Amino acid sequence: MTQDMNDSPGLFDKYLSENRIFRDREVLRHSYRPHILPHRKPQIDQIAAILAPALQTETPSNILIYGKTGTGKTASVRYVGSELESVSARRGTVCRVIHLNCEVIDTQYRVLAQISKLIMGEDETPSDKIKTHIPMTGWPTDQVYSELKNQIELNSGVFIIILDEIDKLVKKSGDDTLYNLTRINTDLNRSKVSIIGISNDLGFKTFLDPRVLSSLSEEELVFPPYNAPQLCDILQQRAVIGFAEDALEDEVIPLCAALAAQEHGDARRALDLLRISGELADRENGSKVTVEHVKKAQAKIETDSMVECIRTLPTQSKIVLYCMLLLHRAGQRIFISGDVTRIYKELTPFLEIDVLTARRISDLISELNMLGVINTRLVNRGRHGRTKEMWFDTNTDKIWEVIMEESDGRLAQVDEQIVVQILR
C-alpha cells in the first residue's frame, strides 16, 4: 500500500507545476501596498500637508476621513504615514505612526493598552524608566491612561494615532476614548499627539459629544467612490505584476471594473473579482482568464456574502427566514407576511423561543429585504387592506443549508408538511 501511494502522483503536484495564470497573486489582495495609489493624489497631498508640521515637531491637526469601503482611505493614510516616518528618520526627528483597527480593538481600555504596546514595541532601546507594560486587562482605566501618557512623554516625539473603523469604537464604547485622546496634549510637554479617524459611516458623528467632535474634526476629508475607468487603472496596475503575460482576455479587466463600479466604486470588490476569476481559471488548468470566469467569480462572491450575512443574523431573524424558506419549499413562490406570521407562531412553542408580535416580525422581514436576502413589495388587496408580498430571487439551497447548520439541529426536526396544514 505504501509503495502504491509513493508511486502515485502527489496530491498537490498539479498545483506546483508552472502556473500559467498567476505570476504573483499576492499583489491582488487587499493587504498589498503598491508604491503608487492611482487616482488618490489629491487626497494624499491633503493628508501630507496636514501632517507636515510633525516634521518640525509641531502638532498636526486631527483629521476625520470618510468614504465607502474600498475607496482607498486606509491605503492612502498608511502611504502618507510611511513616507512621514521615512522623512522623519532622515531628518533626525521622531515621528511615529500607530495604526489600530477599531473593529477588533473596540474598547477604551484595549485602545489605550494597544497604543502603549505599539509604542513600546517600536522602541528598540527603551529607557530604563519605561519598564511597565500595560496588561490587556486588569487595570483601572485611569491608571492605563496615566501610564500611556508617561510612555508617550518619555519617548519624546510626535505620535500620529490612526483609528481605523473609528465608528465601531464609538458605537460600542462611546466617545470617552476620543475625549481623552483629543485632550492628551494638554498633559504633555515633550511630545505631541495627533488623531486620524477613518470611517465608512458619516452618521457616526451623531454619537459624539459636540466638544469631542469639534476637537476630532479639525480637518475633514471625503474619499469619493472610484468610477469604472479609475478601477480599470487600479486593476491594470496590479495585473501587470500579478498575472502571467497574456493570461487575461481583453474584456476581463473592464468587466471587473464595471461590476465593482456598480457596487459604489469598491476597489476591494474589483480586486476580489479579478483574483477569484484567476483562481477559477487556474483550478480548471486553463491558460486564460475569460469573461465566463468573471461571471462565475461574481456569483461566488455574492453567494459567500449572502452566507456570511445569514450566519450573523440574530436568532429571531433566522427563524423568520426559516418560515419563508418553508413556504418557498412548499411551492409558494410569492407569499405574504400573514402566512409567515402564522407559521412562525405555530413553530415558536416547539422551538422554545419568545413569541414576537406581528409588527416586530414585519420589521425583521424589512431588515431581511434591506440585506438583500429576500425581495418585498407592498400590495393593495382592496377591502383586505395592504399587505407585504415577498419572494426569493436567488437559489435557496445554500440559504437552507446555512440555516440548518446554524440551528443546532432543532429546525431539522420540524415536519415541513406543517406548512400545508397551516395554509389549508
UniProtKB/Swiss-Prot annotation:
The cross-references to SMART domains, in alphabetical order and at most eight, read:
AAA, Cdc6_C
What InterPro entries does the record point to? AAA+_ATPase (IPR003593), AAA_16 (IPR041664), Cdc6_C (IPR015163), Cdc6_lid (IPR055237), ORC1/CDC6 (IPR050311), Orc1/Cdc6_arc (IPR014277), P-loop_NTPase (IPR027417), WH-like_DNA-bd_sf (IPR036388)
Record GO biological process? DNA replication
Matching Gene3D superfamilies: 1.10.8.60, P-loop containing nucleotide triphosphate hydrolases, Winged helix-like DNA-binding domain superfamily/Winged helix DNA-binding domain
User: By its UniProt entry, which SUPFAM superfamilies does this protein fall under?
Assistant: P-loop containing nucleoside triphosphate hydrolases (SSF52540), Winged helix' DNA-binding domain (SSF46785)
Sorted UniProt keywords? ATP-binding, DNA replication, Nucleotide-binding
Q: Name one Pfam family in it.
A: Cdc6_C
Residues that coordinate or bind ATP: T71, G72, K73, T74, A75, Y226, R238
Q: Care to name a GO molecular-function term for this sequence?
A: ATP binding
What PANTHER family does this protein map onto?
Answer: CELL DIVISION CONTROL PROTEIN 6-RELATED, ORC1-TYPE DNA REPLICATION PROTEIN
Function, as annotated, reads: Involved in regulation of DNA replication.
Q: Which family does it belong to?
A: Belongs to the CDC6/cdc18 family.
- Record-linked NCBIfam families: orc1/cdc6 family replication initiation protein, PRK00411.1-3
User: Per its record, how is this protein called by name?
Assistant: ORC1-type DNA replication protein
Organism the protein comes from: Methanospirillum hungatei JF-1 (strain ATCC 27890 / DSM 864 / NBRC 100397 / JF-1)
The gene that this protein is the product of is cdc6
